[in-house]
Amino acid sequence: MILTITLNPCVDNTFWVDDWDSLPVKTERQSGGKGINVARVLTNLSVPCLALAPAGGENGALLRELCQSERVPLVPYPIRGETRDVDTWVRRRDLEQRVDVHPSPEMTREECAGFEDLALSLLDRARAVAVCGSACCERAAQAGRRILEAAKERGVFTVLDSNKTALAVCSEAKPDLIKPNQKELAQLMGRDVAPEEEEEACEALLDRGIGSVLLSMGAGGAVFRSRGSQPVRAAAPRVETVNAVGSGDSFLAAWLHAWTAGASSRRALEWACAAGAANAAVFPAARVTRREIQEQAGFSL
């Protein structure tokens, strides 16, 4: 089983409009947050998984309902704060988007301790744990770090796919795999990273004690780097991009699927790039299927 940890879940609301000053002609909702997205795609790929996330208020109840309807195996941890909304407005004629991210809830010290305890109780059943996305607060980021540290002590494969405060804090746990995009790689390095410097930056992360680096570059493909091996590169299939949101989550889910299947580093990277491209070609986010990935990859796992 793969356990995903979403430190800042949301209800994703998509409003389709004819123009920015017009009322929506269609509204769509789905569960959101990077770990939840990863779990949705893992489920589509028949990989056993659980998605642990804090959930509070009316939106927390809605999140649980949405996950149930989407077959996302959510393990909700109740908190007093209100789970956030993320509103995306899409103009139908050209698919241009505007996004409004609502405030995140705070988690109390007691809530974070309970969340950690629940995560640790699930680790005994896990082959891998992936801490994903932003953190709703500093305490939640620290909880994510401690969960990764505890998982490493138990021999569970640890993955970090995060940003901002959560990336800075959780990377201190030196996970077995970190999956930055180019912006997050720059954050980790504390400076801009030119394309010709990316492999050197990945090597620097390995020198810090991180086990391996999976650098996703969107349409530019991806690089996998681990200690004692040559970098592996894969190109991204060419698609007409409709919606890039969720492509990184689909990428990671497909890589984890390949990892559980024992695929080679190259095959896993190609499968992951195909999943990211398949997601970018469709609405809504992070719902790609094995068939859609296979069509982009030209092979199946």
Regions found by a protein language model. Name each.
Residues 1-3, 97, 127-128, 212:
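Structural motif
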Residues 1-52, 60-65:
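Glycine-rich phosphate/adenosyl-contacting loop at the front of the ribokinase-like
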Residues 2, 47-50, 74, 158, ...:
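Hydrophobic anchor at the start of a short beta-strand
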Residues 17-18, 90, 223-227:
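Short beta-strand-to-turn element immediately C-terminal to the catalytic PLP-Schiff-base lysine
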Residues 20-21, 44-127, 295-301:
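Conserved N-terminal subdomain of the carbohydrate kinase-like
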Residues 123-137:
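Short acidic, glycine-rich surface-loop motifs adjacent to enzyme active sites
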Residues 141-229:
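Conserved phosphate/ATP/ADP-binding segment of small-molecule kinases
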Residues 168, 196-301:
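Conserved phosphate-binding/catalytic region of the ribokinase-like
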